[in-house]
Amino acid sequence: MNETLLKCTTRHVRIFTARVENNDLVPDPNQLTLDLDPDNEFLWTESVTKEIQQRFAELVASHAGGELSDYNLRRIGSELEGTIRKLLQAGKLSYNPECRVLNYSMGLPRTPELL
């Protein structure tokens, strides 16, 4: 019987109940895989990426033992979106000017001229 792949998709976060094998997603109810900013809207430093990964691990741990549902995955995804917004507002994360579509989905950049 095929396993069902649960997923959460937000603007900048995708979470799957799967593992990656040979660049393919293989359903796995015992593992969550995070795809961060698939459209490359932001410029990510290693430290900011680690901060998001750490927050993801904390959120997953806080839901350990609970039902693995679409709703809970969406809660984790929404929390990560909020973390991304905070990092952007704090100046730790910036928009990628080379992005395919520069739409400032999390608000206009905070620059001294705009404050």
Swiss-Prot record:
Pfam families, alphabetized: NdhM
Compartments it resides in: Cellular thylakoid membrane
Keywords tagged on the record: Membrane, NAD, NADP, Plastoquinone, Quinone, Thylakoid, Translocase, Transport
Membrane topology: Peripheral membrane protein
Superkingdom as given in the UniProt entry: Bacteria
Catalytic function, reaction form: a plastoquinone + NADH + (n+1) H(+)(in) = a plastoquinol + NAD(+) + n H(+)(out); a plastoquinone + NADPH + (n+1) H(+)(in) = a plastoquinol + NADP(+) + n H(+)(out)
Gene Ontology CC: plasma membrane-derived thylakoid membrane
An example Gene Ontology molecular-function term: oxidoreductase activity, acting on NAD(P)H, quinone or similar compound as acceptor
Catalytic activity, EC: 7.1.1.-
InterPro entries found in the cross-reference section: NdhM (IPR018922)
Main location: membrane
Subunit structure: NDH-1 can be composed of about 15 different subunits; different subcomplexes with different compositions have been identified which probably have different functions.
Family of the protein in this entry: Belongs to the complex I NdhM subunit family.
Cited function: NDH-1 shuttles electrons from an unknown electron donor, via FMN and iron-sulfur (Fe-S) centers, to quinones in the respiratory and/or the photosynthetic chain. The immediate electron acceptor for the enzyme in this species is believed to be plastoquinone. Couples the redox reaction to proton translocation, and thus conserves the redox energy in a proton gradient. Cyanobacterial NDH-1 also plays a role in inorganic carbon-concentration.
Name this polypeptide is given: NAD(P)H-quinone oxidoreductase subunit M
